A protein has these predicted regions:
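Gly/Ser/Thr-enriched, mixed-charge loops and adjacent short helices
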Residues: 13, 107-232, 450
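Short glycine-rich phosphate-binding loop at a beta-alpha junction
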Residues: 40-48, 72, 176-178, 279-285, ...
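Phosphate-binding and adjacent anionic-ligand microenvironments
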Residues: 236, 273-450
């Protein structure tokens, strides 16, 4: 049996891979695991705005209750809100039903422990064992008062909003902000946070209908936000993804700031305040060369992990560091929350703009981005490419052409049937050509997905 859990929980097309039956068995598995230490563990469940969310929420909650766990349903709420609230409200575990930046056809289920951290591999392996046992009807079925209860609490999102607002000491009064909620989990709470801090907020893509999450909007389709910022003569644009654990920004000139630039700005602020632990920022292998160079010039160190916020977080916890994240906009402020938090990230930068009395385009000038090209190859199989001689030769050839002024990175996606080809260096056209050559060979050798 293939492993259920990927790099960010269990994820797939709803009613094909991620069925309500699987959600039910995952609930029974999680209830069994967390029930080993407490007779009636209480779970907090949140979800994004996908049409399948309430169906999977019901199945997951039923599974948890069927083995004796209790459930509090928060409804539509960002992933980082669940991570925070589990810890702050004393829940025994949390679960989020979301496929993050993926299209609405997909959904996913991921769990958090009582400290708000995603589960380690060994616990996910145990849950998979319990899922198989549940499917074979081998797990306990308590009766009477051994069955768990379900409650609904729609106030929890407001507690999260209050928390985010109080991570800064600065009013945002005087700032005009365009907010793109990706028709996702922060469509209500995002505007609540920003307006509560005094900003003038123009909202776009905050009307979810179950089908429009991430559809030509949010952090994966930021073009509309760029236009809106300039149309409204705004100071800042903020884009979340579907579950609001990531954030990209747009400056007053319509230019995009990615996670590398956001981390650098926030890390420098922490350093100036004496709060940047180890004077170190944790990025990934996808971080831009310019990110590393700028950090060094500003007296900070950088570390690169594998792609995936779980690997960034793992390194941060092991080495007691303050800030880390991904170019895609997952930024973790470990002194505030235990996962990437799009709204928390956004208000840190907005506060910095107010404190420095500088437009974002000027603040972003501390880093010069090297051109970077990314080509995604949708493949029939994403395993075995590392051992393919033709693919290896194409990568070596490209690396030789770039020399010391650039690099090539090829990796399989952890969540989709993709192999990603990235090249970085001084010349955009050269990078595009090299990436396409490698991508063509990968497509031929691995087979293109239908």
């Amino acid at each position: 049996m293939a492993r259920l859990f990927g790099t960010d929980g269990v994820r797939g097309v709803v009613n094909e891979f991620l069925t309500p039956e699987l959600a039910y068995h995952l609930g029974r598995a999680a209830g069994t695991h967390f029930g080993k230490e407490k007779e009636h563990p209480t779970f907090l469940i949140g979800r994004d705005t996908r049409i399948s969310g309430s169906m999977l929420e019901s199945a997951l909650a039923a599974g948890i209750c069927s083995v004796g766990g209790n459930v509090v349903i928060a409804g539509v709420i960002p992933t980082p809100a669940v991570a925070y609230l589990v810890r702050q409200q004393g829940f025994d575990a949390g679960a989020v039903i979301s496929a993050s930046h993926n299209p609405y056809l997909d959904n996913g289920i991921k769990f958090f422990d009582s400290n708000g951290y995603k589960l380690p591999d060994e616990v996910e392996d145990e849950l998979e064992k319990y899922v198989r046992q549940s499917a074979d009807n081998e797990l306990a079925r308590p009766t009477g008062d051994g069955i768990g209860k379900i409650e609904f609490n729609s106030n929890l999102a407001h507690l999260y909003a209050h928390f985010v607002r109080h991570t800064i000491d600065t009013s945002l009064e005087g700032l005009t902000i365009v907010y793109d909620g990706a028709n996702g989990a922060a469509s209500s709470v995002g505007p609540e946070i920003l307006s509560g801090l005094g900003a003038k907020v123009i909202n776009i893509n905050v009307n979810p209908d179950g089908l429009n999450i991430n559809h030509h909007c949010g952090s994966t389709h930021i073009e509309g936000l760029q236009v809106a910022v300039q149309q409204h003569n705004a100071d800042l644009g903020i884009a979340n993804d579907g579950d609001a654990d990531r954030c990209l920004l747009v400056d007053e000139k319509g230019q995009v700031l990615d996670g590398d630039q956001i981390m650098l700005l926030c890390a420098l602020k922490l350093k100036e305040e004496g709060k940047l632990k180890g004077d170190t920022i944790v990025g990934t292998v996808m971080s831009n060369i310019g990110f590393h160079k700028a950090a060094e010039e500003l007296g900070m160190k950088t570390v690169s992990t594998a792609v995936g916020d779980r690997y960034v977080l793992e390194y941060m916890r092991e080495h007691n560091l303050s800030i880390g994240g991904e170019q895609s906009g997952h930024v973790i402020f470990l002194d505030h929350n235990t996962t990437g938090d799009g709204m928390l990230t956004a208000v840190q930068v907005a506060a910095l703009m107010k404190e420095k009395k500088q437009p974002l385009s000027e603040l972003a000038g501390i880093m010069t981005k090297y051109p970077q090209v990314l080509v995604n190859v949708r493949v029939a199989t994403k395993t075995g490419w590392e051992d393919n001689d033709l693919i290896k030769a194409a990568i070596v050839t490209a690396e030789g052409e770039l020399g010391d002024e650039g690099r090539v990175l090829v990796r399989a996606s952890g969540t989709e049937p993709l192999i990603r080809v990235m090249a970085e260096g001084p010349d955009q056209e050269t990078l595009q050509s090299l990436c396409e050559e490698i991508a063509d060979i990968i497509g031929r050798e691995q087979g293109l997905a239908e």
